[in-house]
């Protein structure tokens, strides 16, 4: 066998000096241990090694030598499987340089290849040198044998002390010692496999060290890592008196959970993002990194509590359950406790993969509720502590973010607030939310009222900051809150002082990361304390008071302007005009209209001579009161009253008409139109005035004690104004009968204007015709008024009692006397 092996490796020349036992030992160990294994630890077959060798030839650009290599390996496979596998393993252990150089040199020396113009070509019909049907190798594998990398030598086991072991006792029976040897699991396993086996026999300390290291991702002699970075048990193992089967069963579930945890952590690493401005993502990633560090330090602490190692999370680790790994009597319980801790850690990490991977779907408020629920309902104690630590981190995050939003003008609001898109989608929105429809999510840990209050305060603070007046001067001369803070700049500077940091820290000190509490109001308590401690609440309250007072003045201006300004404005065309003319504005100022609010009035681009469509564009936050629908109602009030006023003026201009002198019937007709239009205008103004008095009574907060804040009173003000607008629309019957009443009034006014123009031009027939149209429209108007049981009594006097509508009823009266019923 030695001569055959020596010929295979060295050829004919060195047979004598190379017949050493070491090569034969390598051959034995390679075929016994099969040292080359795949990623799962399974030994590679000869076929797999051959495929690898062929790929290696391609990589080294040695395809020309493939016939030589294949010829040698085919003969070896046919003659001796052991030699064939031995050559494949030794060849795979050769370095690329040794393999390439030796293949070129030996194949040329054996005349298997020829070199022509620098290229190697296979010599046709050449055969390798053969002895006893074993070919000599065409390359040199001796470097791999000298380095001893192909296999490890079996360690020589010390001989057992058999001096005290007797097969038979004094009674002729099998002795107890010999019986225990025969029943030894290791011996039975060795006999079953037909060869000796190798296994670890560990004490408690060694076993726990290997086990804890595996769960932390650290390999050891017992637990190795394969090509897929999965742990596997390298050899059978027994722990003190435990046998191999017991230890294997215990370790199976530990290996399984360790690999699950390793995969989960790798998934987390893959979805971590470093270059991001998303603060909640950064906070969650930091939390998970800290949790992994706590997990490492906790297992180190379990193994050696007396170690003087300084942990980064000393207080947390020391408050976790302690495991007495030195007590051999409770080894099963300790292994189960370790498994439970790792399982708890894994399940929380797996939950976090979903959260971090879809972080945009989770708001801090929702995560806080999730973490609180987990801290109460998680099945394992360690999982409860992990959720509790996340809950505390989120409370700190939310409180710090709220403190930033309430003190910093350019804070990112969308980290805690969400855009509802429309204030109608918010339940009972505040005045500030109507301007900027942001809302804060409510949960088990923060009720809806507090969430709305916080969102409202943040939005109000932003409007306070943006208000030029609040930036340019203080609100008053009084001192309130911290450091006499009365404007946005002072508040922002105060937020950067150590005093402010101390305030926030005191609020958060009550939240203990090591305590397990059932109070879901922790976040609510911290937020309430924050709102009590920072000056923003008082600032926004005072700003709300200013807005409230300005709003009341604004309402007074709107009512006055839209019910009387038409008297003072000229009747020129309004096309393509967006603001009041300078002359008109000066005229209005002389009539006592507020100059600041007057600048907010302009003409709509659709405004005509008949329809004086006005727009109101007040600055924030007053613009919340005049939405498009509200502006339309105000504009229609102005248009209708202006039309009625114009019609009355046109009737007045017919007094000196010669047509009325000749046609007594027309004198009554114009008297009738005059009194009817005047009565309609009077009734409308009366209803508007009644609604306005009720509106002002609601806004008279000073005459009656009210415990509500200015912020809440603004909401009262908004709702009262909306009611006033509805009453005004009702006074003009704009919404009655699907809005047709307003159009009927327009037709009536048009008939009056046309009749007046015909009368002035001497067209008595035309004036009579337009009067008939007026009567027909009046009948329709009265029919619609009857449907309104509340306002109909005001218009009952306009009913035409008889078909006799000519001027004979007023035959002895002058037209000027008929007109005298008008009073302005």
Curated annotation (Swiss-Prot):
Question: What InterPro entries has UniProt attached to this entry?
Answer: GCP_C_sf
Sorted alphabetically, which Gene3D superfamilies does this protein's record hold? Gamma-tubulin complex, C-terminal domain
Source superkingdom: Eukaryota
- Name of the protein in question: Uncharacterized protein ZK632.5
Organism from which the protein derives: Caenorhabditis elegans
Phylogenetic classification of the source organism: Eukaryota, Metazoa, Ecdysozoa, Nematoda, Chromadorea
């Amino acid at each position: 066998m030695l001569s055959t092996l020596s010929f295979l490796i060295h050829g004919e020349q060195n047979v004598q000096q190379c017949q050493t036992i070491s090569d034969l030992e390598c051959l034995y160990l390679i075929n016994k241990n099969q040292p080359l294994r795949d990623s799962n630890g399974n030994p590679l077959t000869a076929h797999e090694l051959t495929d690898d060798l062929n790929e290696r030839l391609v990589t080294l650009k040695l395809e020309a030598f493939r016939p030589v290599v294949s010829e040698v390996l085919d003969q070896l496979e046919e003659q001796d499987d052991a030699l064939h596998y031995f050559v494949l393993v030794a060849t795979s252990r050769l370095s690329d340089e040794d393999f390439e150089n030796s293949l070129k040199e030996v194949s040329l020396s054996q005349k298997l290849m020829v070199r022509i113009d620098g290229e190697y070509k296979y010599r046709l019909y050449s055969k390798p040198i053969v002895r006893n049907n074993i070919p000599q190798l065409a390359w040199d594998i001796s470097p791999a044998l000298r380095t001893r990398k192909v296999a490890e030598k079996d360690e020589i086991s010390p001989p057992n002390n058999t001096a005290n072991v007797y097969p038979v006792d004094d009674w002729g029976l099998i002795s107890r010692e010999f019986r225990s040897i025969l029943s030894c699991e290791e011996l039975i396993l060795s006999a079953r496999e037909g060869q000796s086996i190798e296994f670890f026999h560990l004490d408690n300390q060694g076993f726990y060290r290997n086990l804890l290291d595996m769960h932390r991702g650290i390999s050891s002699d017992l637990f190795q890592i394969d090509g897929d970075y999965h742990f596997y048990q390298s050899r059978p193992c027994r722990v003190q008196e435990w046998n191999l089967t017991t230890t294997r069963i215990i370790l199976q579930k530990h290996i399984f959970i360790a690999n699950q945890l390793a995969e989960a952590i790798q998934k987390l690493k893959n979805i971590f993002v470093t270059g991001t401005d998303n603060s909640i993502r950064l906070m969650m990633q930091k939390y998970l990194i800290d949790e992994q560090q706590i997990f490492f330090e906790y297992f180190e602490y379990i193994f050696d509590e007396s170690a003087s190692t300084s942990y980064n999370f000393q207080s947390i680790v020391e408050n976790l359950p302690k495991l007495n790994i030195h007590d051999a009597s409770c080894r099963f319980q300790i292994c189960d406790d370790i498994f439970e801790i790792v399982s708890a850690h894994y399940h929380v990490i797996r939950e976090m993969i979903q959260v971090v991977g879809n972080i945009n779907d989770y708001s801090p408020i929702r995560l806080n509720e999730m973490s609180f629920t987990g801290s109460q309902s998680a099945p394992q104690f360690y999982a409860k502590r992990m959720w509790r630590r996340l809950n505390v981190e989120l409370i700190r995050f939310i409180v710090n973010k709220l403190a930033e939003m309430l003190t910093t003008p350019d804070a990112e609001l969308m980290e805690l607030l969400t855009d509802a898109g429309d204030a109608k989608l918010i339940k009972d929105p505040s005045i500030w939310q109507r301007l900027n429809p942001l809302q804060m999510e409510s949960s088990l840990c923060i009720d809806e009222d507090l969430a709305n209050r916080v969102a409202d305060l943040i939005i109000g603070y932003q409007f306070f900051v943006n208000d030029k007046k609040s930036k340019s001067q203080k609100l008053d001369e009084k001192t309130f809150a911290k450091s006499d803070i009365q404007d946005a700049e002072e508040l922002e500077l105060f937020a950067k002082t150590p005093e402010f940091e101390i305030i926030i820290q005191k609020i958060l000190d009550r939240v203990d990361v090591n305590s397990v509490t059932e109070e879901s109001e922790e976040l609510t308590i911290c937020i309430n304390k924050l709102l009590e401690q920072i000056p923003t609440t008082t600032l926004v309250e005072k700003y709300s008071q200013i807005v409230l007072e300005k709003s009341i003045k604004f309402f007074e201006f709107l009512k006055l302007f839209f019910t009387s300004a038409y008297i003072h404005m000229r009747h020129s065309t309004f096309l393509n005009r967006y603001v009041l003319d300078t002359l008109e504005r000066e005229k209005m100022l002389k009539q006592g209209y507020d100059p600041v609010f007057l600048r907010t009035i302009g003409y709509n681009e659709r405004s005509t001579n008949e329809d004086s469509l006005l727009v109101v564009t007040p600055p924030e936050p007053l613009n919340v009161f005049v939405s498009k629908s509200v502006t339309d109602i105000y504009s229609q009030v102005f248009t209708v009253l202006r039309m009625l006023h114009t019609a009355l003026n046109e009737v007045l201009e017919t007094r000196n008409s010669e047509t009325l002198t000749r046609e007594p019937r027309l004198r009554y007709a114009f008297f009738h139109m005059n009194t009817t239009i005047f009565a309609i205008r009077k009734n409308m103004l009366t209803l508007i005035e009644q609604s306005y008095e009720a509106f002002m009574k609601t806004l008279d907060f000073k005459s009656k004690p009210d415990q509500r804040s200015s912020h809440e009173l603004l909401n009262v003000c908004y709702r009262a104004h909306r009611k006033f607008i509805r009453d005004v629309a009702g006074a003009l019957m704009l919404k009655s009968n699907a809005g047709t009443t307003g159009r009927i009034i327009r037709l009536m006014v048009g008939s009056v204007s046309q009749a007046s123009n015909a009368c002035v031009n001497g067209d008595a027939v035309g004036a009579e015709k337009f009067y008939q149209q007026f009567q027909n429209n009046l009948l329709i108007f009265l029919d619609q008024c009857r449907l309104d049981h509340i306002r109909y009594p005001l218009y009952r006097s306009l009913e035409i009692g008889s078909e006799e509508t000519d001027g004979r009823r007023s035959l002895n009266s002058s037209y000027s006397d008929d007109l005298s019923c008008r009073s302005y």
